[in-house]
Structure formats: C-alpha cells, structure tokens
Amino acid sequence: MQDFWQAAAAQLERELTPQQFKTWIKPLAPVAFDEEAHALRIAAPNRFKLDWVKSQFSGRITALACEYWETQVSVHFVLDPAASGRAAAYTQQAMQQGQDAPAAMGTAMGAGHAPYPGMAGMAGGQSYGPAGAQVPGAHPNQMAGYPDYPSQSNGAPAGYGGAAGGQTPYSQSQQSAQGRGAAPTGHPLQGNSAAHLPDMGEIDVAQMDPAEASARSYRVPSPQPAAPAGAQQQSDTVHERSRLNPILTFDNFVTGKANQLARAAAIQVANNPGKSYNPLYLYGGVGLGKTHLIHAIGNFMLMENPRARIRYIHAEQYVSDVVKAYQRKAFDEFKRYYHSLDLLLIDDIQFFSGKNRTQEEFFYAFEALIANRAQVIITSDTYPKEITGIDDRLISRFDSGLTVAIEPPELEMRVAILMKKAAAENVSVPEEVAFFVAKHLRSNVRELEGALRKILAFSNFHGKDITIDVTREALKDLLTVQNRQISVENIQKTCADFYNIKVADMYSKKRPANIARPRQIAMYLAKELTQKSLPEIGELFGGRDHTTVLHAVRKIAEERSKDAQLNHELHVLEQTLKG
C-alpha cells in the first residue's frame, strides 16, 4: 500500500501544478487496503481537503489504484487530522524517486506485479485509457487538472470515472525533470547580480497556453542579504528616482493559473527588455497583480543595472506632469527625460481617456522609446480596443506588442495568497480558515487582504483564536453583500442580453450552437461567481443533470485558456456582473 502511494504521488506530481499538488495531494495518506473487498482508504487532514479531493481527484486516484492492483478498486476518503504527518514521509520518498511516472509505477509494483497494459509506451503529452485505449490529451490545468469531455465508453472497467462518472484518462505532464527540480540554466543580463532569470530567448510566450507556462520552472531573484548602509542609501535614492516599490518583486508574487501567462511574459521582458513583446500590455480587474508585476520587472532591471533609466508612473500622474510642463514652460526638458528612458512603466492607461494633449505627447514619447529599443509596459482595466476616448493611433500601438489578461485568482491561489499575507504579518491562520475565506471571496487580492485584516482585528479585539466561527462573525457584513451580489438569474439575463438570445433559451432543451454556447458560458459563470452547487445550477437551467453542468464548466474553462476572443467575452461579462 505504501509502495502504491509513493508511486501514485510521483505520478500525480507530474500531472498537477506544484500548487495543486502541494495543496491537495501531499497532505493525503493511505490508511488501509482491504484485499478481499479491493477497497482502499485514504485519509485527509481536514474537512475542506476531504470534500475537495473527493469531488475533484477521486476518479484519477481510483484509476491509478486500478492500474496498480490490476482490478477494480474502490477508493474511500476518511477524515484524520493526523494524516498530514504520515503523508509527508510517503510523498517525500516519491519525490526522491526521480523516475518517469510509468517507471515509478512499475518499480512500486515489485516483482509480483507488472505495469498495467495501458501504461505501456506513454509519452509526453499523450493520454491513454485502460488496455491502451487512446483518448484525447488532458489539459493539466483545468479545474483540478483533469479533462473536460463528457462520459464516454472505451472499455474502461467500472470505477475509472471522476466525480461525474466520466472517463478519466491518464494525463502525462509536459513538465521535464528540470521543471520539477533542477534549476534551469540562467541567462545573465548586463550586471553583476548572482541571481538571474531563466533564458527565455527561444520561448514564444504568445504561443504558450497557460498549462505550458505553468509547467516551466523559472528561477527568479531570491531575497538579497542586507546591504551596507551606504549601498542601502544609494538603493533608496535609485528607487525614489524611478518611483519603484522595492517590495514588489517576482519572489513574492503568488502565481496561479489566473496569472501564470502574464508572469511568463513579464519574465521574458525582464530577460530581454526592448526586444521581446514591446510594448507589453497587461489588463485585468482591480487588485489582480498588474501593478505588482510591472514593479517586479523594474526592480529586476534595477538590480541587474542600477544605472538603468527607469520610470514607473500612474497615468493620472503623467497627465499632471504634462500640465506642469506647460505651466512652467519646461516641455523640452519633459520630452528629453521621457524620451531617454530605458524602461517606462505606465499604470492604468485608461485614465488618458479624453485627454487629447496628453495622448499626443505620450504618442511621441512612445514612438521615441520604441525607436531607441527601450521597453514600454502598460496596464489597464480592459482590452485595448475597449478603451473609450483613446486615439486610434495609440490603440494600434498597444496592439502591436503582446496583450495578456490577468484573471481573478482560482481557489488554490487565493488560499496561497492568504497564507502568505498572514505569514508576512507573523500570524498563524489555520488552513481551514484560509479555505473558508477563499471559497467565499473570489474577486481580487485586495479584497482578500482586507478580509484578512478584518479577521485579525476582530480576533485581537475580542481576544479569540482565529476559527471558522470567528471568521464568519468578523466577515458577516462582507459575506452578506457577496451572497446577494450575483445570482444565477442575473447571470442568465446578462448572458442572454450579451449574446442576443432569449432568457427562456437558458432553460430550454434547444441545442443550436447560438443557444447552447451562451448557455454553457452562463453555467460556467454561475459556478465561478456564485456559491451554488452543480446540482443547484443544473436545476436553475431547466432541470439539467449536474454532469451536464460539469461538462459545460470544464469545456469553457479549457477553451478560455486557448481562445483569446472567448477570454475577452468572459472578462466583459464578469466585469458587467460585478459592477
């Protein structure tokens, strides 16, 4: 049983993102295997992990168990607070095996076992079902890392289905041994820093899907030792001149599926300023990490070359600088400064809307910087062509580089953010509390930070330990607002209006593409933006089965990561619903 779990953990580590594996699989521990009943019991340390693993990972774990014992196996999950301690030993051994997943499974079986036939010959991105039955390759970052097609029969024995009873094929990760452990070869920039970003010269981020972006392991700058007093004073002066926040670095940027492509693009630009993706245009809602990323790029360039001419500026401040330059008759000096920069970071460019003179000056500055091979990085709350009141010449320049969206963080990422923020405050927050907050607050990082501050203040004021009950009491007003803010009915109406269909079509059995597609999108948004369960959502969509809803959610989630137009439509719908 222990050999099975070590091999299974090694396989799952290859299939899932590091954050997913650490959050959900690593804390699990095998309890017992009943050879007569072919039943495996696996323990989870708390109720949150137990429920999530049962709903998202049971099918895959069952499939691995069936492979190992070469028979149908039922997997049962039980609650055991001591599970994490036992799990650490199992997963640590699995991580040290250093074998490919099929080989690891074969080794764990020992002399009395042979690898399951379906495991033979598995390669990089190919997926196989039992007995070599080939199925479509799995996208490693959907929902909990599993495919999103409906139930299908290809000779698989019972017990291979996921939570929805669908086929669970065997997904092979794109992640290499380098991506799992060894640090990649660095690509030094000009400068003498010992910490380097990876060489991404041959990686086309624009052609990467988020799964590939996350499968690559990047070595980013580590926290630097304290500098001598004189050097520290010089560093402070440099940051004051550039207006960069030295705290915002790649090292403390929490990465997840929602922002991994943006982070990969930022690393590419930091490695090759003025060469790759110029301009880089990042867009997304409030509090999703756009400002953090562009500060991280600037801070890395400053670390590599303290003499680099870098300027971070908010669009409103740029407008103010233009006005002051006119008032003081210092426009030549203004132009000379901005046209000579090595890196210009301009935040919230939508504030240029309607400011024609500012737009004209920025256009000339933009042209000069690009001609000089200086890097320009822009953030906004929306897609370039959706900004109103901006000159078409500027819009076309924004579109000439790389445009990347940053989405609201997914559950695991929200939990990681909360735990990291709590650690920064030297406060211990129970994991189940972090999960509770993350499940109820979904919109952005600032909202999570605000919720954490309220919890800490409430706990200190009342002299109570931080528990779920205390958290619920501290956030009762916020949770009430969240619960009444977005309803499934509102989502249905908004999607119907957006795609020009009738609201009644959301409940109907009609299946033309122009109706089925908006209905699937509405189901996806209902799952993402409300607390409704899959059966509840299905009932509100004309009494549909929960498996239909699950298929729609996974289908749209996968397509969103690959289809820029769909991603943009979903972004508009989400912003509309959130007001």
From Swiss-Prot:
It comes from the Bacteria. ATP binds at residues 287, 289-291. InterPro entries: AAA+_ATPase, Chromosome_initiator_DnaA, Chromosome_initiator_DnaA-like, Chromosome_initiator_DnaA_CS, DnaA_C, DnaA_dom, DnaA_N_dom, DnaA_N_sf. GO terms for biological process: DNA replication initiation; regulation of DNA replication. Belongs to the DnaA family. HAMAP family: DnaA_bact. Oligomerizes as a right-handed, spiral filament on DNA at oriC. NCBIfam families: DnaA (TIGR00362). This is Chromosomal replication initiator protein DnaA.
